[in-house]
Amino acid sequence: MSETENRQPKNIKNNPKIMKAWAVYDWANSVYSLVITSTIFPIYYSILTTAYEKKEYVAETKTWIDVPVRHMIRIFGEEYQPDAVYGYSLTISFFVVVLLSPFLSSLADTIGNKKSFLQFFCYLGATSCMGLAMFTGMHNVFLGLLFSITASVGFWGSLVFYNSFLPDIATPDRQDALSARGYVYGYIGSVVLVVICLVLIQVFAKGAAQQLLFTRISFLLTGAWWFGFSQYTFKHLPQFGDVKDKLPKDLVLLNYKNIFKRHEEQGGFFEVFKDNLSFYKDIAKESFHELFKVGGELFKDKNLKFFLSSFFFYSVGMQTIFLMATLFGKSEINLAQDKLIGTLLVIQIEAIIEPLFSQDYPRELVIKMLFQLPSSFGLWLVFGLIS
């Protein structure tokens, strides 16, 4: 019996402890979605990139309103609005995840260490959230954007491997309920931390300077929350598979403890990497070949093709709203901070209800609705909104 088999529980599927550990990761990482993506960080970014507010008279209402005047961010000699640069930075993070996911997923399947990749992206995201506390103004705005990018890569990259565990730990009849459980954990956990952060910022902070300080502390709390609660997941989630014989004996990604020893023997890290370059090339070639093969198979089914197409437009639209709504509300509409966060909290709390009931729907009915409604209604809705 292999070492891997020894360290794995005998009953992996539908094991209550393992399923709970999987769901707890949603509790851990969902704070990024609410604190960093949707509420506190976008408002903080908008405040730090606003030069001043000027008074403008509105003749219709015969009132004076405060209009923010934004700093401009210079990139390669051109000036850009801070909100646009923020959107571009998130786009970069998604491109990184899209490019890395097929290769890393294939590599993880080959060497059987999905949990290690999940840990890597989790720690990347958590430390990046804490790194955002170093963003204090326009003088280091690129540092803030860099940590925003790496936090996004960590979050979305970890979800690739997190979601791939679902069919490994639960049978099909339990997967919907477990997925819903994860969503509920995530929604509740993120609301709890946001409330804690808001109490710090709005109640304990005295004056604008302290509010900014406690906001940065909120970023530290977000990273610590993500890192800390994920340890329960990593403790109980099994590492599937074992290292296969076809792998290079001293593969850097596996035998990282021997890197320094080989560094002395062979004259450098890059020499070690070059020894295994053919392995990485084979993995990359196989991963993208499999990606296009699966894509071709999916689009052979008419219903599935329409569903994926409509879901793509739906997902793009919703993600754009989630990522940019707060900045738009703060910078363009000049909504008050408490109204912005209050609205998002109401939406988050309302979202807890749906997963609690959706797991009880007949599975066949849900699948039928997913395949028929988006394909017929989703595209028309998208086209209607565009027009």
Where are these regions (language model features)?
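C-terminal membrane-cytosol helix-exit motif in multi-pass small-molecule transporters
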Residues: L193-A205, G223-V243
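Glycine-rich segments within core transmembrane alpha-helices of 12-TM secondary carriers
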Residues: S179-I201
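Short amphipathic helix-loop junctions that connect adjacent transmembrane helices
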Residues: I36-A84, T320-G342
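Helix-to-loop junctions at the C-terminal end of transmembrane segments
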Residues: L99-N113, I353-K368
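Transmembrane alpha-helical segments of major facilitator superfamily
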Residues: Y86-V97, G342-A351
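C-terminal ends and interior cores of transmembrane alpha-helices
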Residues: V98, Q119-H139, S376-S387
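Juxtamembrane intracellular "pre-TM" segments in multi-pass secondary transporters
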Residues: S2-M19, P238-L308
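A single, central transmembrane helix in multi-pass transporters
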Residues: K274, E290, V294-I353
